[in-house]
Amino acid sequence: QGNVTTAPIRSDDGEAEPELATGDLNILLLGSDSRALESDGFGEDDGTERSDAMVIAHISSDNTRIDAVQLPRDTLGDLPACDDNGRGSYDGGFGMLNSALQYGPACSVAAVEQLTGMTIDHFVQMDFEGFIGMVDAMGGIDVCLPEPLQDGHARLDLPAGAQSINGDQALALARTRHALAEESDIARLGHQQMVLSAIVQKATKSDVLVRP
């Protein structure tokens, strides 16, 4: 419906159609920090794009099991040289894993493959606006917070306890760092995992999957 675009997963793929999968699949999920919603208070667009969240989802060949591993975005390492179609090129160098996305998703794929030794078969990239729209289209998600959370930087203000949250609140919960005592990326991963788990639980309900 015009909301989904495709791109080669590797710089040398060109216009090749993806092959039909016959074995296990590794899919890289990228949450972009693109400031598409600058006017709504999500911060200024500094002209770059990084991955706020990175998850490798492994799907077994018989479709009976899905395992997910989250990668800390501040992971430091040697990023490989990369030529991404439509984004220019990167000569490689030492840097944070999340910075590879500014050169395009194929460069993020190359960086994750070098770090993990895994082969990534596909990727899915979503920005702030897409994430909010997805959660709202599902009718919100259910979470349970052990304590209230407030973070003006992420526009987060949630009470403690079980509650249903909308797309804006889910994004704020996944992004908050200042609401946590540690204010670290590792601490933030816990909230991202909570949000992702709630999305999966909501999406797998039969009444959600049959909605147009």
PLM region spans:
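Non-catalytic, solvent-exposed segments at the cell envelope interface
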Residues: 1-212
